[in-house]
Amino acid sequence: MKGKIVSFILLAFISVTPAYGQTTIKGTIVDSLQVGIPYAAVKVLKMDSTFVKGVAADSIGCFQTSVPQEGKYILIVNSLGYDSKVQIVEANNASSSVITLTPNSIALHDVVVRGSSITRKDTHLQIIPDKQIYKHTNNGYDLLYDLMIPNLQIDRQKGAVTTIGGTVTLYIDGRKVEYREVKGLKSKDILKVEYYDVPTGKYAGDYASINIITRPMTTGGYISVDGTQQLAYQEGDYNLAAKVAHGSTSFTIFGGYNRLHYDADKIEREEFFHFDNNEISRSYSSYEGVNKQNQEYVQLNILTKKKKYMLSEKLSLVRKENPINQTNGILFANTAQTSTAQCSTNTSYSLMPRLSLYGNIDVTDKQYVELSLSGTYGRNKYSNMYKDEKLNTNTIVKEDYYSANFYGKYGIIFPHKNSLSFHLGSVYMNTMSQYMGTYEAWQHQWSSQSYAFVEYVQQFNKWRLRLKPGASALYYHTKDADAVSHYIPQLQSTIFWQPTKSQQVSLDILFSNAYPTSSSLNTAEQIIDDLRIKRGNENLRPMDFYQGTVNYNIQIGSKINITSFSNFVYQHHQYVQTYYEENDKLINSMDDHNNSRGFIEMLSLSWKATDNLRLKIDGVYNHTDVWGKFRTTFNFWRAYMNVNYYCNEFAFRIWANTKGKEMILPMITVEHVPVNYGGSINWNHKDWSFEVGTVSPFHKNNEFIETLNVPVYNSQEHIISSTNRKFYIQAAYTFNFGKKTQKDWKNIDMNVNSAILKAK
């Protein structure tokens, strides 16, 4: 009853009444062992034997198709090696049929039917998992990793999906979700994955997008538990989920706890300060420290899915605490003439409730409306303490953070794959911070970004043109500073050419803008030590950027996929960290009097050598130039490799990355990343999953090197983290009751919003 009331309220919010017309026939085709039969052909006939339509099952034997009206229909099912099956079914949106085929006596021996796992569908790659992947993966991240999609890097432990040059936005059934959320989605409930390397439609604006399509279920429920424990240091991640489905409405509750406790990073740093009246050199060596973090979350999901609409209501609460992050060290100044003991301590606490509403309605067969509204409140506290023989500072910050996000879309689908859509959205932020202690101030910021776009897609045989003109309005204001408003047209245009079914070339051009982060756009400052101060800049201007991308994909047979990716970007008013002298102190702030250009070239190959052996290799080259108040040139290349081998109920995974360099603007520190490698052994049996794994097991002192060179300051820092080397065990179990129900996902944003300027 509560679910129906909430759904009714959201329908009233959307103010659109859906129309009903067609109904659905769906089911699963299995063999005598109840194992899904892939790619079986299904014919749908009326009771008078009039042909209605045909459909093919997917890689695990599931099919779904619409018919004009409810009632009885005849299904004829055929698959190579099995006798044909004729079955009468009742068409309605609630029931699902199970059709069992029996092997025939004249089946051809040594004939294997394979469906291509990666195919090009219009503007995206469609990836259908095969039996081996379903058998040897447990959650959404495992499945995405084993699919070996070209140009993607999947970190199963951190829960991150990235591509060279940017991050990938994740969606489940068209709804935007966070990276961590996909972990709760069971792999066996995923029908297919859509990868938009050049996002279009509702995904336009993303650097790259993944939409995970799941299998709908209407009855039953489940209770699921999973846990991961690190053995090299103290870290545990434990989660519990329960779901009940009734008809078109499902209720899901999640809860989880994460604890991290480890020795602080070992740091060796050399610094040179080039002040006008003084040259200072010093070195720093840490000798002990500790870092503790705790995190808890709970979330309630209510989901209603009908033929003509889908509604979602989500309420979540996240608590994050960093009770201590302390490092003790010795500072040697002016070539070890003097030494000073140092102690740096940071603590933080955050509590963030969040409400999200989403609706997708088919007004007609050719028109649809999509609306989303979310609101967040954050109560944050942060403290920064520094102590040596000469200086003792302590700054405490308390913050109230409010944000809201609205998005609306109306779309029309024309014949021949042409479409027209209208997009409208707004993002609002309001934060109030009280700084107390060594630095005292009251800060108030608010900002908004509103945008409107029109998108049109036109098909010309093997060519497709997409035009998306629009405009955005940026406004932000910090207390005691001038308000900044910025109105600018925006444009995204993409040309697709598909010379053959297995090849596609795309050219994408983008002109857009962005405004600075709230933590940079302020007047606050934090004391790092007796010579260094970190300060905000309330006068930062919006940044304009121009981007061009050429993408080429080719599929060779059903085993090899190759992707070539070339990207050029130019940014005006590039945000860059700046360093300057003030009263014999080094000030670290942010500056926008810079421009940058960058070029990225990537080549990716995935190879399905056999049903049991899979391989993926990526190579990337990156070149960046920055000029203006700060000038630098940056080049690097790096290679990545993944190998998977399946044997019975076991999966063996190994991966390796070459050493490389990273510089991610606005940070101008160059980080030298060492060789990294790892592996795991996974065992999946029915509802149980166990895994043991390791990262860099033979590199106890895996060292990261960070270098910074600006006119007033040079530094080189060697960092050895106790968390670089990992040994972990992982276990998961799911108890199903009633009919098997789709495993839901933890649709929860674990990031806490804050505009506090932090020392580190």
Where are these regions (language model features)?
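Surface-exposed extracellular loop regions of Gram-negative outer-membrane beta-barrel proteins
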Residues: 205-227, 327-329, 372-378, 419-432, ...
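Short, ordered, surface-exposed loop/turn motifs in non-cytosolic proteins
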Residues: 33-46, 70
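Membrane-proximal, glycine/serine-rich, low-complexity loop/turn segments characteristic
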Residues: 22, 34, 60-62, 83-85, ...
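Short, acidic Ser/Thr/Gly-rich low-complexity loop/linker segments typical of extracellular
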Residues: 48-62
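A short, solvent-exposed loop/turn motif at the edges and junctions
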Residues: 45-50, 72-87
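Outer membrane beta-barrel strand-and-loop segments of large Gram-negative receptors
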Residues: 403-405, 451, 535-537, 541, ...
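Outer-membrane beta-barrel translocator domains and adjoining extracellular loop/strand segments
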Residues: 264-279, 323-340, 355, 381-390, ...
